[in-house]
């Protein structure tokens, strides 16, 4: 099994080849740069959310999504979503993706999957669908 340092070295090599290895780290030329970018983007997003409030932030995201859909067209937008889903599946692993699907399958228009699982006593192990690092 690879040590943490070996794994970081491999991720750094991939980043230096132009691959994004940290979610939110797009544009960073090293692993450390991608981690730094992701942290900054996360903090910036939280600051903006605090400024706009929950509803305003949600609306801003919705408008951005609609704009992107117009730019890419329906098929391009669908392809982008598919690629994102595949990336997320790789990050979580098969077991995590399965567990996330179980939770999503419990959701209804009136109740989230998490709420329903709690109400019905269904165990959903959310630690399985955290990004593997």
From Swiss-Prot:
Sequence repeats lie at residues 24-43, 44-63, 64-83. It comes from the Eukaryota. Residues 1-133 are annotated as: Disordered. Induction: By abscisic acid (ABA) and osmotic stress. Signal peptide: none annotated. Residues 24-83 are annotated as: 3 X 20 AA tandem repeats. One of its GO terms (biological process) is response to abscisic acid. Keywords: Repeat, Stress response. GO terms for cellular component: cytosol. Lea proteins are late embryonic proteins abundant in higher plant seed embryos. Belongs to the small hydrophilic plant seed protein family. This is Late embryogenesis abundant protein B19.3. It comes from Hordeum vulgare (Barley). The gene is B19.3.
